[in-house]
């Protein structure tokens, strides 16, 4: 039962944080495409680690990350207003590079396949 509740809370917080980032944060530094990939809320509901994937050049990534980190208070307030929980979790922004790593692995596999077809 507890696992099911934790999963529901994680998904609800993920949905709301994504909506807040895309619709409510008006920071001009948030120019790169930001995707919320996962959220892990601790069992005591005190902390929520929000994993984001940021697409764009390095400068845009850094600026977007700074914008997100400076907006954690606003994000927390909005999550508390939109998701009815006993405690509003402290939001911690973490960068998730798994999508970029997956794209890199896909490129490597594609180049290996091309090399094998050229050898034959």
UniProtKB/Swiss-Prot annotation:
GO terms for biological process: maturation of SSU-rRNA; ribosome biogenesis. The keyword Cytoplasm applies. It is found in: Cytoplasm. GO terms for cellular component: cytosol. One of its GO terms (molecular function) is ribosomal small subunit binding. The keyword Signal does not apply. InterPro entries: KH_dom-like_a/b, RbfA, RbfA_dom_sf, Ribosome-bd_factorA_CS. Its main location: cytoplasm. Keywords: Cytoplasm, Ribosome biogenesis. One of several proteins that assist in the late maturation steps of the functional core of the 30S ribosomal subunit. Associates with free 30S ribosomal subunits (but not with 30S subunits that are part of 70S ribosomes or polysomes). Required for efficient processing of 16S rRNA. May interact with the 5'-terminal helix region of 16S rRNA. Belongs to the RbfA family. PANTHER family: RIBOSOME-BINDING FACTOR A, CHLOROPLASTIC-RELATED (PTHR33515:SF1). Monomer. Binds 30S ribosomal subunits, but not 50S ribosomal subunits or 70S ribosomes. This is Ribosome-binding factor A. The lineage of its organism: Bacteria, Bacillati, Bacillota, Clostridia, Eubacteriales.
């Amino acid at each position: 039962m507890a696992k099911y509740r934790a999963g529901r809370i994680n998904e609800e917080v993920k949905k709301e944080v994504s909506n807040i980032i895309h619709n409510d944060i008006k920071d001009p530094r948030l120019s790169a495409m930001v995707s919320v990939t996962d959220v892990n809320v601790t069992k005591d509901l005190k902390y929520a680690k929000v994993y984001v994937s940021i697409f764009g050049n390095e400068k845009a990534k850094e600026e977007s990350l700074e914008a997100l980190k400076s907006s954690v208070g606003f994000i927390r307030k909005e999550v508390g207003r939109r998701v009815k929980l006993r405690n509003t979790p402290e939001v911690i922004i973490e960068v998730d590079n798994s999508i970029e790593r997956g794209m890199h692995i896909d490129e490597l596999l594609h180049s290996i396949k091309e090399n094998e077809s050229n050898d034959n």
